[in-house]
Swiss-Prot record:
Substrate binds at S60, D147, N159. The keyword Transferase applies. It catalyses: L-glutamate + ATP = L-glutamyl 5-phosphate + ADP. Catalyzes the transfer of a phosphate group to glutamate to form L-glutamate 5-phosphate. GO terms for molecular function: ATP binding; glutamate 5-kinase activity; RNA binding. This is Glutamate 5-kinase. Keywords: Amino-acid biosynthesis, ATP-binding, Cytoplasm, Kinase, Nucleotide-binding, Proline biosynthesis, Transferase. It comes from Gluconobacter oxydans (strain 621H). InterPro entries: AceGlu_kinase-like_sf (IPR036393), Asp/Glu/Uridylate_kinase (IPR001048), G5K_ProB (IPR041739), Glu/AcGlu_kinase (IPR001057), Glu_5kinase (IPR011529), Glu_5kinase/COase_Synthase (IPR005715), PUA (IPR002478), PUA-like_sf (IPR015947). Residues 285-362 form the PUA domain. One of its GO terms (biological process) is L-proline biosynthetic process. It is found in: Cytoplasm. Disulfide bonds: none annotated. It is an enzyme of class 2 (transferase).
Amino acid sequence: MTAPASAPRLAQARRIVIKIGSALLVDSANASLRLEWLQSVCADIADLRSRGAEVIVVSSGAISLARHRLGLTSRRLRLDEKQAMASVGQIGLAQGWSAALAGHDLVAAQLLLTPDDTENRERHLNARATLQTLLDLGCVPVINENDAIATGEIRFGDNDRLGARVAQMTGADCLVLLSDIDGLYTADPRQDPSARHIPVVEQMTDEIMAMGGEPPPGYSSGGMRTKLLAARIATRAGANMVIAAGQEHHPLRRLQNGGLCTWFMAQTDAGSARKRWIGGSLQPKGTLTIDAGARRALEESASLLPAGVTGLEGSFGRGDLVLIRDADGSIIGRGLIAYDSEESQKLIGHRSGEMEQLLGYRGRDALIHRDDLALDLP
């Protein structure tokens, strides 16, 4: 568990998801945002953006902001009360992020997600496409769990795992968990003075997972255990993950400058992880037959456009898996389709510019985006 020569660096990442917990963002004394701290984080984000990185924020804090304002601080909240607190606090949280990012000429965009948005294929495609468009427009998406509607049975439960799912969904190459601790230790350093800091974790073994404990008291619903669960998700999806202390101003700058932290090494790259999932974990619902020109385009890593599709079989919904067959009848790949079978039938053989006339609305140009393709070409 010693640092390898090629230990990752934040400056090397091109798409970064940053998770920030309630205890860092909300001042427990007066239940308000730590505005100077938040402004320093946004300055760090602006610096990362200036270096060419795309940044997505996963931010807790809505419930913590609201429960003090509404006088519900002395007892554990019921689920319906948490949902009400989220509705109240989310407004102030979004306003705080918007103002702080605007100070660096950055535009904030708010998204509230539930597990279904990352696990249901159709909603997954919608959420990912929205995030990609926001990044293309130069925005900084600020994401939180949609606590106002999520139930106990269908919720992430903590934003560490939400951050990992967002990293997985967007193909991020780095997930940063800013915390009240500077990484993983062999034991809880607050209770065991002999605990040793672990700078790099190369494999998520049972021994590593056993180092997680119960969540500490206070605002945060997460603890080291949830961070290790997030690390397992993120590293399997091809993202490096880092746990770093975030209490002081400019925590990302300090991380870039070599501050104490723990890196969890990606077990693959994001593209390969996604293509393995598409290629081997789902059952196909239909088949598209393509012409020679479309095959050549796929060989050059292009998306599958409707003009190159000559035939369609099966009944499928948006986000379902379909097989791709070339003109010789060979199955050359599979992918997640952006339209259902009825709409796809209307589109095949037509140019993307005709989509609006054919469907009555302007949809996505590709039947299958290149990121949703897993090819098996000879």
